[in-house]
Regions:
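Alpha-helical, largely C-terminal catalytic domains
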Residues: 1-311
Length: 311
C-alpha cells in the first residue's frame, strides 16, 4: 500500500453529516478535545472529568503489540482495576510493571470514578462498568484481525470493531454528562441498541479513514480500508470511496433512528434526548478533532476541501 494515494472528502461539510454541525459549539471547542464538544452544556468540572475519562480509549495500546503475554496481563489487571474503582469489589492491582503511559491510562480513573460515584446512582455505574469491561476485554486482541491468514469480510470486521474501537465506554458516560440516572433495562430497547451500534460504526469507520497512514507507519493495521481492498481487489482510493459510502449509509440509519425516537411517546424521553444529542456530538467531535489537529495529516494536505495524502 505504500506510495498509493487516497482522497477523503470534507466529512465535516458532507451533505449527509452537515445538519449535525453546530458552529458555535465548535468555536467553544477550539482546543480540539472531544470533551468540549460533548460537554458543551455541562459544568466545567464535568468537562474536565470527561476529558480524563477519554485517556482509556485514546491512548496508543500498540506499545504492547509485540509482547502478547504482557498485553494479556495488562488486560487482566485492567479488568481488576475497573471492578475496584467502579464496582468497589476487588482490591486495586499493582500496575508498576507496566510502562508509565499505560499506568496513567488507568490511574486517571481514580479521580474520574470518584466524581462519577459522587454524582450518579449504582445502576448508572453498573452501565458504565459493563461497557468499559466490554472494551477492556478486547485489549489483547488488537492487530489480530488478519490472524491465521484469514481476511475478514467487511461485516465481520465492523462487528469486531464495535468492541475494539472503544466507543461504547464513551457513550456510557452520557448519563454523567447530562446529570441523569439510567438502568440497563432502560437501555435494552431495540432502538437504543441500534443507536449505539450506528454511532460506533460511524466513529470507527471515520477514524479508520483518517488514521490509515498512521496505522501503517506504526505497523498496526486494524483498519477498514485494507479489508475493503483485499475483499474486493481494489486500490486504496477506490476502497476509500466505498468506505465513504458505508459512512453515508450509517449516517442515514442514524437519522432514521432519530425520527423513530421523536415519533415515539415513552417515559424515557429525557434519556433518549440526551443519548441522541451526545451520540451526534461524539461523531462530529471526532471529525472536528481529526480535521483541526495534525495527528493524522498536515493542514497543507487539505486541498479544495479534500484531504489528499500518500500512504
Amino acid at each position: 500500500m505504500r506510495g498509493l494515494k487516497a482522497t477523503i472528502p470534507d466529512l465535516a461539510r458532507h451533505e449527509v453529516l452537515n445538519p449535525w454541525i453546530e458552529r458555535r459549539k465548535f468555536q467553544r471547542a477550539d482546543f480540539g478535545v472531544f470533551a468540549a464538544i460533548i460537554c458543551a452544556r455541562s459544568l466545567f468540572e464535568v468537562l474536565c472529568t470527561e476529558f480524563k475519562a477519554f485517556a482509556l480509549v485514546v491512548f496508543d495500546c500498540g506499545i504492547l503489540a509485540n509482547d502478547k503475554d504482557k498485553a494479556q496481563e495488562y488486560r487482566a489487571q485492567s479488568i481488576q482495576y475497573f471492578h475496584a474503582v467502579l464496582g468497589e469489589k476487588d482490591d486495586f492491582p499493582n500496575l508498576t510493571c507496566f510502562p508509565e503511559e499505560l499506568q496513567h491510562a488507568l490511574l486517571c480513573w481514580n479521580e474520574v470514578a470518584d466524581h462519577i460515584r459522587s454524582a450518579r446512582s449504582k445502576d448508572t455505574l453498573k452501565v458504565l462498568l459493563r461497557q468499559i469491561l466490554y472494551y477492556v476485554e478486547s485489549v489483547d486482541t488488537l492487530d489480530t484481525v488478519y490472524s491465521r491468514n484469514h481476511v475478514p469480510s467487511p461485516k465481520q470486521y465492523l462487528s469486531r470493531r464495535e468492541r475494539t474501537a472503544g466507543v461504547y465506554p464513551v457513550i456510557a458516560t452520557i448519563p454523567f454528562i447530562y446529570g441523569i440516572d439510567v438502568s440497563q433495562q432502560q437501555l435494552d430497547s431495540e432502538l437504543m441498541q441500534l443507536l449505539w451500534k450506528h454511532t460506533s460504526h460511524l466513529v470507527h469507520m471515520i477514524n479508520d479513514m483518517f488514521s490509515l497512514r498512521k496505522e501503517i507507519a506504526d505497523g498496526q493495521i486494524e483498519n477498514l480500508i485494507p479489508v475493503l481492498m483485499l475483499n474486493n481487489d481494489v486500490d486504496c482510493d477506490t476502497a476509500m470511496k466505498w468506505a465513504i459510502k458505508l459512512v453515508e449509509e450509517a449516517a442515514q440509519s442514524f437519522h432514521n433512528i432519530k425520527r423513530h425516537f421523536q415519533n415515539s411517546h415513552t417515559d424515557t424521553h429525557e434519556i433518549t434526548t440526551a443519548f441522541l444529542e451526545v451520540c451526534k456530538n461524539v461523531i462530529m467531535g471526532l471529525t472536528h478533532w481529526s480535521y483541526t489537529g495534525q495527528r493524522h495529516f498536515h493542514h497543507s494536505e487539505i486541498v479544495d476541501g479534500k484531504i489528499i495524502f500518500k500512504v
